[in-house]
Amino acid sequence: MEDSSTSPTPADGAERARRTPPHRFPLLIALAVVGGLTGAAPATSSFAAHEDAGTAPKQRKAEYTSPFTGLPAKRNPVLAVKIDNHKDARPQTALEDADIVGVEKVEGGLSRVFAIYSSHYPETLGPVRSAREYNVEQLRMFQRPALAYSGARQAVVDKIEKSPLYGVSHDDHPDAYERGGDHEPPHNLYGHPDKLLAKAPKASKADDIGFRFGAEPSGGTPTEEQTVDHGSSRTTFTWSAKEDRWLASFDGEPAKSTSGKRLGGKTVIVQKTDMPPDSSGKTPYIETVGSGEATVLRDGKAFTTRWQRTSATADTTYTLPDGRRMPFDKGQVWLVYQQR
C-alpha cells in the first residue's frame, strides 16, 4: 500500500531571481547621461541600483532531512554507542544529543542503552560499556556504522570484526576514550565522537531505516504512562503535555543527563520480540529480524502496530492495522525491546 506519511527527502532548492532583460541597459545609460547634464545624481549610482536589483541571490543548499528524526540535519556518518545503564552509571552524558536511544535487556534482567548519533555529535559521551552478540545483526540496519564499545567476550569481538560494522573498542583504541567523571570504575569510561569516527573513516552516512514521520494518525488510545519490565529493572515513559514529549524514567527514577536535562523522546517504540539465550547461554539474544507487535507512543496516545524486518540488511517497518505505515512525531526516537 502506498505510504501516505512523510518520507525523509531533501527539500527543493531556492528559486532563482529574475534578471533584468538586456535590452533595458541602453535606456538606463541614456537616462543617466541626461540626469548628469541636469545636475541629478551621477550615472554610476543609477547603474549600481540596477546591478543590485538584477543580481540573482545565491542558491541555497538543499536541506537534508534526517531519516532518524525527521528534522533538518547534516548527512553525517552513523556512530552507534553502547551506553551503561547500571544505577551506578547514572546520570549518563549526552543521551539527549542522540537521534535514537534504545533500551535493551541484558543478563540478570538489567538493561543497557544503545545510542545512535548522526545529526550532530557531542564532545563527550558515555559511560561506554560492552557490546553483545545481537548487536551485530541489530546494527546492520544502519549499513556499516561505527560501533563504540568498551570490549566484549572474544566470540563477540570475532563476530564484530568479521561483520560489516566498524568496531572501535576501548581495548583496541584507548586513545579515543578517557576515564573520568564522578562515577567509579567500570562506570566511568567516556568516548570522544571525533576520535571514534576518525578510527572509522568509511562509516556509512545516515540513510533510511524504515522510520516515517508525519502528522498524528487517527485512532490511538489516550495513554499517560507505559512501563517495560526487564526483570530486575524497568523503563517507564510518562506523557508530558507541557513538554510535548514522553519523559523517561529508569527503575522509578527520572532519567536525566549530566547536563541536568530530563531525558525523553517525541516518539517511543515498544517492540515485542523473542530473546532466547545467545551462544554463551547467559545473555539474551534480542531477535531484531522477524515480526511482531509494537506499541508506538506519540502525542499522548498509544498506537498498536506490527513491526517487520525481513533480514539483517532490511529496514524495520511499523504498520497500522489498516496497512498504512505508522508516522512518528519529529524528534528523538526511543526504541525499547520487550520480551514476548
List where the protein language model places each region:
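N-terminal export and membrane-targeting signals
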Residues: S4-A32
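A surface/extracellular/periplasmic glyco- and lipid-processing/surface-interacting theme
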Residues: T55-I100, E107-R340
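C-terminal region of N-terminal signal peptides and the immediate post-cleavage residues
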Residues: G39-K61
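Sec-dependent N-terminal signal peptides
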Residues: M1, L28-S45
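Intrinsically disordered, low-complexity segments used for protein-protein interactions
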Residues: R19-L27, S45-A49, S66
